[in-house]
Amino acid sequence: MIATPLKHSRIYLPPEASSQRRNLPMDAIFFDSIPSGTLTPVKDLVKYQNSSLKLNDHKKNQFLKMTTFNNKNIFQSTMLTEATTSNSSLDISAIKPNKDGLKNKANYESPGKIFLRMKEKVLRDKQEQPSRNSSLLEPQKSGNNETFTPNRVEKKKLQHTYLCEEKENNKSFQSDDSSLRASVQGVPLESSNNDIFLPVKQKIQCQQEKKAPLHNLTYELPTLNQEQENFLAVEARNKTLTRAQLAKQIFHSKESIVATTKSKKDTFVLESVDSADEQFQNTNAETLSTNCIPIKNGSLLMVSDSERTTEGTSQQKVKEGNGKTVPGETGLPGSMKDTCKIVLATPRLHITIPRRSKRNISKLSPPRIFQTVTNGLKKNQVVQLQEWMIKSINNNTAICVEGKLIDVTNIYWHSNVIIERIEHNKLRTISGNVYILKGMIDQISMKEAGYPNYLIRKFMFGFPENWKEHIDNFLEQLRAGEKNREKTKQKQKTGRSVRDIRKSMKNDARENQTDTAQRATTTYDFDCDNLELKSNKHSESPGATELNMCHSNCQNKPTLRFPDDQVNNTIQNGGGDDLSNQELIGKKEYKMSSKKLKIGERTNERIIKSQKQETTEELDVSIDILTSREQFFSDEERKYMAINQKKAYILVTPLKSRKVIEQRCMRYNLSAGTIKAVTDFVIPECQKKSPISKSMGTLENTFEGHKSKNKEDCDERDLLTVNRKIKISNLEKEQMLTSDFKKNTRLLPKLKKIENQVAMSFYKHQSSPDLSSEESETEKEIKRKAEVKKTKAGNTKEAVVHLRKSTRNTSNIPVILEPETEESENEFYIKQKKARPSVKETLQKSGVRKEFPITEAVGSDKTNRHPLECLPGLIQDKEWNEKELQKLHCAFASLPKHKPGFWSEVAAAVGSRSPEECQRKYMENPRGKGSQKHVTKKKPANSKGQNGKRGDADQKQTIKITAKVGTLKRKQQMREFLEQLPKDDHDDFFSTTPLQHQRILLPSFQDSEDDDDILPNMDKNPTTPSSVIFPLVKTPQCQHVSPGMLGSINRNDCDKYVFRMQKYHKSNGGIVWGNIKKKLVETDFSTPTPRRKTPFNTDLGENSGIGKLFTNAVESLDEEEKDYYFSNSDSA
């Protein structure tokens, strides 16, 4: 807002349109008529009056129209809008009024004359209202909201600019120049309608105090209606009664709203509320303070300073003539009594302020109320809180309680440090105050603050007796968590510096390839001729690592892309005799993609479990890990390595098809040009494969380096990709090899339970100078390929590839790699049982001198698989075992089937299968256990057939039934013959019917924590409940049926027993099974008789009534369908 402090009492500024501005007095000078950068003392302002009176009519929109809600009263303000503001901002700091000249010239009128003049002005404005309406312009549509001043009592227009400069003892108007410079300099000459001139009642009453010479004026605003309070920014819903004074100051506050709030004790607090974040702004240069003026019954109108609480604010004691002491807060330096301030800022007004949390109201509460509560505390020393909660203070070393005050509504109060528990709801603080906790703890606020549930339960109804122990444990956890976060931040900062160090070390390794193995960041680079290591600079993809193999006589140039979440060490080995003269340069890159990092230092193995499967980051590690956990090679060991690293067998799986390459490039967000270049580079070279690599269907590509100096081409130089970290044991520690190998092999079963985990175990052995022939090596390798092809029936995530067993001169490297594509998943599996003896035989045949236990890392190909198949421990395309089937059927029987996520819950209960697999398996075999036996029987037969043992199968197929009819041997031959028939040709009619698919098993009940559950543990043990709940039912008593007969059957014993029984009862005549004694079924529901009264009858004679059960069934059978073995026509 632009306001000029007028120094003459008869001058007033009506905010009229341009047609009425011609009636302005001589001393009214507008700022826009003063050139910028001009020093304009007050006495020289008169010469600018002509320019100010010659304003054009297009300047009408400089004045804003302020309307009421019903548009009946129109208020105007002398505020310039932002649209017509001059581009040159006015330097008000140059205005230095002549204090001496103005001191004696000020001639002020009495308050009575001022009121009479204002009343006349209101009546005159009411008569001229139609003419003004035609000349008013619409307000500018800016981002600021308009402040509506409702007044529906009388239809009168009030003037917004009131100048009531009252001076006691004819004191001059003084302004602090320094404060004006701090607040006004550099601010553009613009304003908006959110400088609040609080509405004044149209029937202005002159409330003169008892002592008239004091000229104390109080202008009383109308009490607003409940519906008209929504323009206030200070909790209009709390029935805020707004009152203001047309007093000696004009209140301005940048980005603030001046409003008044009434408390219960008729104390009016004028708050300065920030419109942006509902907090006070500590800007003294833009917030003006006033003296408090008595209103009505002596209650005080206190204007709050720009601080949040009343603590620390400076107050004055101004003695008024009526003898009352009125406290006033001063926000500007120096004496600011009875002053009017010029502010050229553009405050921003947001009428609807986003509401904060309930707990933040305590920061915005009126200072006067806090002062009243504080005074009450000093007297009573007892505070009652409701909706209370616990908060940690003093860097998690103590606690306090916070809650709503019962005496004052909607005011939150927090205590000092709690030191003593008087009762469960009565506490004493360090300052001596007593806090009484009413009701239960505020659980919602406690959970939002991050407190654990067990602590909330302990303090649910108050403080327990051992509250100190619980609080100390909780605060200790908080402090430990902060320390861990600080350490993590430091490691992250250190990791950023490692990236720069790695780049510089890479360049140094190119130039100086001597003695760099003992650095923290090294590169394994055995250069020979034109063999180079090219690392992509990751301009398009920062996380993907590309290694291009370049040779002088290149035929194979596959582009390798390491899997995600895999920590790589790259070794490039050159050929020939130059290896002995070169130094080992190591570069180790680590990547920690998640919190789950488990390091086993004793076994020299590390397991990285990744939560984010598809994160592509640069492989970084902090310096402390590099330096502390890395064992550098000694000079003797490096020389020994350089001699013995002549033979290394590399396993590389390049991407064959163009589509797969494009998908892999798209995963790492490479550009289209890069994808095309990579595809064109890889596809032609893959077509030029060597004959050895073409013969390998499962390994797809193999490089064998340094077989001999003249026999092998340079394209067999290897690029060996290993995981994690290479450690060389001392030459004398040969006995540690066996133990470490056993530890490695023990971890192999765990691979089946961890999805996307790729384990590489790398053993380096001593090689002798004599070389094996190329033919023998090729033959062994072809045998290894044949073994891999035979075992591709086992489909799993892990691809365990064991390279061929080498003689003493070769370096055997058992490698476990992850397949690059889904097609190769079926080709890269060897059973674990075969993996162990192959490695053991290798260790026995070759003299092992060096050991390279490498870590297990987590790799992921999430995009190529179903998103629901990423559960940990998921085993894909593997046959179901008995345990999984049992879990499947128990889960299917217990879980409710009408809910949408039924199969997902079943898969979660099984734990190792996807929902699709569970559904497919249950639909294939809903009864479960029957077909599983056939599957387990087929497995060894298939494995025997795959291993070439066809002789036994041929013998079984040529079995002839030669035994006589009715003999035990005949029965066994028939059973063997039937078992060898192809079972795949027979379809199970009942498993394929639609009714069978729609069969729904009765679900059992979920686990319940209640002890009074009617059906306890139904899902765990789905058996018939006890007869305590259900009525007694008499079941048929068959004396010959025992629990042992209901179990599994041994065929050999059963056949012998049945045959002997058959032979023994043959002479008696009749059906053998009909001679078994049976007790008649009773129909009454009497209490079952004890067992001691019904002893077991060993006589299985004619008295048995079991034949009556099967009479109808036996008679209905045809003669052709009678059981051949149990009929009377059996021959001896």
Curated annotation (Swiss-Prot):
Disulfide bonds: none
Subcellular location: Nucleus; Chromosome, Centromere
Gene3D superfamilies linked: Homeodomain-like
Region (Disordered): 123-154, 306-332, 482-518, 765-798, 923-957
Residues of the SANTA domain: 383-469
Cross-link Glycyl lysine isopeptide (Lys-Gly) (interchain with G-Cter in SUMO2): where in chain: 7, 65, 211, 262, 534, 612, 639, 647, 727, 742, 840, 899, 956, 964, 983, 1079
Biased composition (Polar residues): 130-150
Domain SANT: 875-930
PANTHER family: MIS18-BINDING PROTEIN 1
Chain's role: Required for recruitment of CENPA to centromeres and normal chromosome segregation during mitosis.
Protein name from the UniProt record: Mis18-binding protein 1
Gene label: MIS18BP1
